[in-house]
């Protein structure tokens, strides 16, 4: 993915409006402290048994598998390596050989502890991002700086100061995109503030089932890259969203961090005919007809 992605035009998508007041009330709430639910231990053991007995690949539950699941889990929680500190991940390393126990016996406490810290770290990052928008003067785009958009293989930050610098550049990058779209600083503050507050709102709406799905999906992807686990609730939602995607703009969408990404374009559909969208494009705004674009990041 290039550092500067194009604004993808998504036609005929309906946008649900969220009031600013509701967002502010949600931001004031505390982060949830998530823990496994009673059914998760049984579900984990059944899913593991199904994979080990019925999957076409022979799976051995051992430390090697455990380490792969652990690495995948951390990657899913912090894909861009801009949330966890290096010391956080180092402290998790003591559990790297325990994830076979997590999936085989349904002992999920370790995974939930890591997830709860991830929620806290993300909250800190978005609060810092919002604080950068309080400046009366916009960012100086004349400085010779670069923002590394793809940090999948980057070194993890070793201090809060390094994290802050990463996020300063991220916010500046977001502001630059809006500046190039013709927005003034006041409007940029409004748009990005709303985006980051909505991200905080989503953090505070996290549920135990969200953690469970990520753990099980980490296991499934290690078994086979094209294998996924979806909880019943999310499977239903996924099917609905897939149907809407295919019937609406003619594209298959997926979530990646704060973005909706085009996974594939359906031949002959509206997106294909428009020649405006292609796989890996990020949708940052949508509109209908000649109306203004609505920001959909976050």
Name these PLM-found stretches.
Residues 267-282:
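PDZ/PDZ-like domain micro-motif
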Residues 1-8:
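Bacterial N-terminal signal peptides that target proteins for export
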Residues 259-264, 271:
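Short beta-strand segments of a lipoyl-like beta-sandwich/carrier module
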Residues 17-19:
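N-terminal signal peptide c-region/cleavage motif recognized by signal peptidases
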């Amino acid at each position: 993915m290039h550092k500067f992605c194009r604004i993808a035009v998504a036609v005929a998508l309906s946008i649900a409006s969220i009031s600013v007041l509701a967002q502010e009330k949600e931001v004031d709430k505390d982060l949830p402290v998530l823990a496994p639910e009673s059914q998760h231990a049984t579900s984990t053991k059944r899913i593991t048994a199904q994979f080990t007995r019925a999957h076409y690949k022979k799976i051995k539950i051992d430390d090697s598998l455990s380490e792969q699941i652990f690495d995948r889990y951390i990657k899913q929680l912090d894909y861009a390596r801009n949330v966890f500190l290096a010391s956080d991940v180092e402290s998790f390393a003591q559990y790297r050989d325990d994830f076979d126990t997590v999936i085989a016996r349904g002992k999920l406490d370790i995974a939930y502890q890591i997830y709860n810290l991830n929620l806290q770290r993300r909250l800190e990052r978005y609060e810092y991002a919002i604080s950068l928008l309080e400046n009366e003067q916009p960012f100086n785009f004349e400085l010779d700086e670069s923002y590394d958009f793809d940090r999948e293989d980057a070194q993890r930050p070793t201090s809060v100061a390094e994290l802050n610098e990463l996020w300063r550049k991220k916010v500046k990058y977001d502001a630059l995109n809006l500046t190039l779209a013709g927005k003034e600083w006041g409007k940029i503050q409004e748009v990005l503030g709303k985006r980051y507050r909505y991200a905080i709102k989503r953090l505070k709406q996290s549920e135990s089932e969200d953690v469970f799905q990520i753990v099980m999906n980490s296991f499934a992807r290690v078994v086979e890259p094209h294998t996924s686990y979806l909880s019943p609730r999310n499977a239903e939602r996924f099917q609905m969203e897939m149907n809407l995607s295919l019937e609406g703009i003619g594209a298959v969408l997926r979530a990646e961090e704060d973005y909706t990404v085009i996974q594939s374009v359906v031949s002959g559909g509206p997106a294909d005919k428009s020649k405006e969208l292609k796989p890996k494009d990020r949708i940052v705004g949508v509109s209908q007809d000649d109306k203004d674009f609505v920001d959909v990041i976050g």
